[in-house]
């Protein structure tokens, strides 16, 4: 499944996270783990992409390659079987499909790719008139952080609505890097 991801995010304090959590009181959290994939030469980063395996409870997993666009990022997603997931995580063996083809087209040395580490997130998701909200608490490399993301259809309208939402909830906008960037900075 491929889609154009247009999202806005802000970093949160623990207090802001806990305050917003009240808006998600009727939502059960999703536990997910991102395993970030890169080469020693940082070929994925140099190609301005992000590459990960995301696992969920109940042995569900997906492989994702994010490719920046003029607005947002093209997200290529491929569902994984438990065997494919294990082959990636244990043996750095990637399944055939559009993601592998794209990496090869971009001359990424597949044989050099490996798992850098993982980031665990407790996520609350809720659809709203603005878009799909995700309230996250992430743990990685001995660190913990909090963020609010909203995925929208329209960049300009989405940005305006997101900033209005933050103002309404008395939260200062604090730009945040992507999870993979925050993870990588702490390696």
Could you tell me what each predicted segment is?
Residues 1-187:
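Phosphate-end processing signature that detects enzymes handling 5′-triphosphorylated RNA
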């Amino acid at each position: 499944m491929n889609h154009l991801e247009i999202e806005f995010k802000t970093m949160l304090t623990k207090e802001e996270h806990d305050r917003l959590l009240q808006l998600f009181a009727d939502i059960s959290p999703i536990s997910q783990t991102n395993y970030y994939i890169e080469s020693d030469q940082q070929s994925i980063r140099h190609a301005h992409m992000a590459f990960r395996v995301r696992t969920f409870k109940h042995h569900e997993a997906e492989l994702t390659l994010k490719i920046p666009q003029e607005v947002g990022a093209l997200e290529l997603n491929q569902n994984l079987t438990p065997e494919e997931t294990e082959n990636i995580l244990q043996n750095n063996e990637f399944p055939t499909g559009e993601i592998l083809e794209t990496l090869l087209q971009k001359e990424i040395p597949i044989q050099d790719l490996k798992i850098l580490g993982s980031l665990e997130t407790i996520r609350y998701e809720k659809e709203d008139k603005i878009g799909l909200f995700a309230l996250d608490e992430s743990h990685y490399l001995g660190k913990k952080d909090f963020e609010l993301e909203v995925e929208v259809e329209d960049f300009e309208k989405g940005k305006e609505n997101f900033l209005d939402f933050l103002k309404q909830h008395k939260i200062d906008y604090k730009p945040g890097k992507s999870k993979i960037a925050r993870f990588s900075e702490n390696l």
